[in-house]
């Protein structure tokens, strides 16, 4: 009897296994990315279903953890030695690069999910050697287990690093539950080579196949002073956090580099003062690494062999570590005290004149002219070096606006320290959302405008009888129910699960800039707000101490209108409502910051701005992902909002019903009706449905409507709601999804912190 051979060919590269082979994405690369609505669910989470991260964090020996982190800073390991005997610079970079991927346009990126552990971030060229930083932390993470998430630990370690080198931080807040899989929703750009930027800029670079090195370009590029970065990106190159430290596309021009710095830092919510503080403060510590050319550097973690165990960038130069380390290809130590907080960076920036040179790896950098060798070597106490700087460091001197700030910081170290402390806190907490999510003993008491503050509840809340009476009064106001539904949706759907901003709490729908957004139907909005303000005034004028906020009334009115719509459809149902929202003031609202949240498109309301944009159905899925919705939840909400007649402009596109305003499943029934034939009547954006026999016009629709009959997966869901037994299920599911959206920002109600479920 012969021995059976393994069906898998030895060392075969043929992916003839589950998940291998040519995929749907390969055949149809432009297909709708519904997979982003199936991420970060209980299926991928190894923790128990009832695990409460907030409770776990609050039981943490916080001071013991910080003590262990402080000890680690100077506990140099042979397998990855500490520069200058202190890991502070490495851990500051780790925390900075964890948080620094955040961008204002969609709130994605940032430190909130610990995504630096996963592809692509774990293998970005800008994150070389951070794999070692996280492994240095593993014994501490192992000790404290699930009481501290990786997401929180990466940031706290950066704080402790600063404190261990004499800097007083502004504070720290925990509250970042981990995710357990690589994020597929964030758009990082279209380039297919590391360090490329030829897709995000009209005239960019094609990139490089080198590892552990940036691009050096001798040529001058006129467009770098005025080029415009693709939205929503906030990095100048694929695989970089912000900008190329050698200068734009490797061109060592500090003035041109300032343009890229201002653009990218601005897209991360930083103004000029915060930008100068972060660069000067961060570069007070540590060094860069470029001991030899990039040819010595091996594959990144995602491409390295199994034996590397998740580490990457193996370096064959010398020992491959310590004095032989290659990270960026730059070899710069900014100050003579790289493990102490002081003003040396700014002092040297203005004290010396600088001349262009190259690192041992061939990267552009600058060296002080006619300067003494005052900079210590990271590993040899007998060696000294001349001061060195990056091109982007010199931008703080040669850009007029940056120079003014930098000189003020030089002359007023106290202002510099305060600005850096605040900017660092903002950098590392910008994507955490409201203060209600903050955990731990070091949460600063000062309320900051970028936290989108909302006053605390300071009065008794309405009870069940009050709610019933208020609903009756609202529905008797004479305002069409669709105005209340539209206003409630407009308020609540500003929420972004990415950075936890937006939502109905605060009633900012009545304030600038939201009240003026094109997507928010102005007549309907004014009509609804006017009626609700009158209801609020009458209720709050009563003799008792109970009060109702406008934010609560906006949501309550939407709920009441949905209940009426369900009743009119023959399916009475109670829509849940929990009071406790408060009203923010205009002074508590950063208009510029909220402007970034104005949608280019909102398929839930059939809104799309301008022709130069992705297709409406892709924006619809993007919006659904930001709302933490599943594909079924997105589907049922669109179908319900259409029959409720809530298109932003009052149009009838997608209103496939003879009973607009009633919460029926008519949208799905008529969309899937094979007696209707569809044709394009608006350049692929508008469609007309006609009777197949008579040719008579029946409906009009947008891409955000027809996708539910066109896309195979969405059609499968639509069929459930279009079936004869699907009408009541449709109403129940719509109410559940509606309630979810209305409460996405109610962190005050959520007794535990988890990744929001998509059901």
Swiss-Prot record:
PROSITE patterns xref list: PEROXIDASE_1, PEROXIDASE_2, PEROXIDASE_4
Comment on bound cofactor: Binds 1 heme b (iron(II)-protoporphyrin IX) group per monomer.
GO biological process: cellular response to hydrogen peroxide; hydrogen peroxide catabolic process
InterPro entries the UniProt entry points to: Catalase_peroxidase (IPR000763), Haem_peroxidase (IPR002016), Haem_peroxidase_sf (IPR010255), Peroxidases_AS (IPR019794), Peroxidases_heam-ligand_BS (IPR019793)
Subunit-level organization: Monomer.
Protein task: Bifunctional enzyme with both catalase and broad-spectrum peroxidase activity. May be involved in protection from the host during host infection.
The protein, known as: Catalase-peroxidase
Source organism: Aspergillus fumigatus (strain ATCC MYA-4609 / CBS 101355 / FGSC A1100 / Af293)
Gene field: katG
């Amino acid at each position: 009897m012969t021995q059976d051979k393994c069906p898998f060919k030895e060392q075969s590269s043929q992916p003839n296994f589950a998940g291998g082979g040519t995929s749907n994405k390969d055949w149809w690369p432009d297909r709708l990315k519904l997979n982003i609505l199936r991420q970060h669910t209980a299926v991928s989470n190894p923790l128990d279903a009832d695990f409460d991260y907030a409770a776990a964090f609050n039981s943490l020996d916080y001071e013991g953890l910080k003590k262990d982190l402080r000890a680690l800073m100077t506990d140099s390991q042979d397998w990855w030695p500490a520069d200058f005997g202190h890991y502070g610079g490495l851990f500051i970079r780790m925390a900075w690069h964890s948080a620094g991927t955040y961008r204002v346009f969609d709130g994605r990126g940032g430190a909130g999910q610990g995504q630096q552990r996963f592809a692509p971030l774990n293998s970005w060229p800008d994150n070389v050697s951070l794999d070692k930083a996280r492994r240095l932390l593993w014994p501490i993470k192992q000790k404290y287990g699930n009481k501290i998430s990786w997401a929180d630990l990466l940031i706290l370690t950066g704080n402790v690093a600063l404190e261990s080198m004499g800097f007083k931080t502004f504070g720290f807040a925990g509250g970042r539950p981990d995710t357990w899989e690589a994020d597929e929703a964030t758009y990082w750009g279209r380039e297919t080579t590391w360090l490329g930027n030829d897709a995000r800029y009209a005239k960019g670079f094609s990139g490089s196949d080198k590892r552990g090195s940036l691009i050096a370009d001798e040529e001058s590029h006129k467009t770098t002073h005025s080029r415009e970065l693709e939205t929503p990106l906030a990095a100048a190159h694929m695989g970089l956090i912000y900008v190329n430290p050698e200068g734009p596309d490797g061109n060592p021009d500090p003035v041109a580099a300032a343009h890229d710095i201002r653009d990218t830092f601005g897209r991360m919510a930083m103004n000029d003062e915060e930008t100068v503080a972060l660069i000067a403060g961060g570069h007070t510590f540590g060094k860069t690494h470029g001991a030899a050319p990039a040819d010595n550097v091996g594959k990144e973690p995602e491409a390295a062999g199994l034996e590397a165990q998740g580490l990457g960038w193996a370096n064959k130069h010398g020992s491959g570590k310590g004095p032989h380390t290659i990270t960026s290809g730059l070899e710069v130590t900014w100050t003579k005290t790289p493990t102490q907080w002081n003003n040396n960076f700014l002092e040297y920036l203005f004290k010396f004149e600088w001349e262009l040179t190259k690192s041992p790896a061939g990267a552009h950098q600058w060296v002080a002219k006619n300067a003494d060798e005052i900079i210590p070597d990271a590993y040899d106490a007998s060696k000294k070096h001349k001061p060195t700087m990056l091109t982007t460091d010199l931008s703080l001197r040669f850009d007029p606006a940056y120079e003014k700030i930098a000189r003020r910081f030089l002359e007023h170290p106290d202002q510099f320290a305060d600005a850096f402390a605040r900017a660092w806190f903002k950098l590392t907490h910008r994507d955490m959302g409201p203060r209600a999510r903050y955990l731990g003993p070091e949460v600063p008491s000062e309320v900051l405008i970028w936290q989108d503050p909302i006053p605390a509840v300071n009065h008794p809340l309405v009870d069940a009888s009050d709610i019933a009476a208020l609903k009756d009064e609202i529905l008797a106001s004479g305002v069409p129910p669709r105005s209340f539904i539209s206003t409630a949706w407009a308020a609540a759907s500003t929420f972004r699960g990415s950075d936890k901003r937006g939502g109905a709490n605060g009633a900012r729908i009545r304030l600038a800039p939201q009240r003026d957004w094109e997507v928010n139907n102005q007549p309907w909005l004014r009509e609804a707000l006017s009626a609700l303000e009158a209801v609020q005034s009458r209720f709050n004028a009563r003799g008792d101490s109970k009060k109702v906020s406008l934010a609560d009334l906006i949501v309550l009115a939407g709920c009441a209108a949905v209940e009426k719509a369900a009743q009119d459809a023959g399916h009475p149902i109670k829509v849940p409502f929990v009071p406790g929202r408060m009203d923010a003031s205009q002074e508590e609202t950063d208009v510029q910051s909220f402007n970034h949240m104005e949608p280019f498109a909102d398929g839930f309301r059939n809104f799309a701005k301008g022709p130069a944009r992705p297709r409406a159905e892709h924006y619809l899925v993007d919006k659904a992902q930001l709302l933490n919705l599943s594909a079924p939840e997105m589907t049922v909400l669109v179908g319900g909002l259409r029959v409720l007649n809530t298109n932003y402009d009052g149009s009838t596109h997608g209103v496939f019903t003879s009973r607009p305003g009633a919460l029926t499943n008519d949208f799905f029934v008529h969309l899937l009706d094979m007696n209707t034939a569809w044709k394009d009547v608006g350049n692929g954006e508008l469609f007309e449905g006609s009777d197949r026999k008579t040719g008579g016009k029946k409906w009009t629709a947008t891409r955000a409507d027809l996708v539910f009959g066109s896309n195979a997966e969405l059609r499968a869901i639509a069929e459930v709601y279009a079936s004869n037994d699907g009408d009541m299920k449709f109403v129940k599911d719509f109410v559940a999804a509606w309630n979810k959206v209305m409460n996405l920002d109610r962190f005050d109600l959520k007794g535990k912190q988890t990744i929001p479920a998509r059901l």
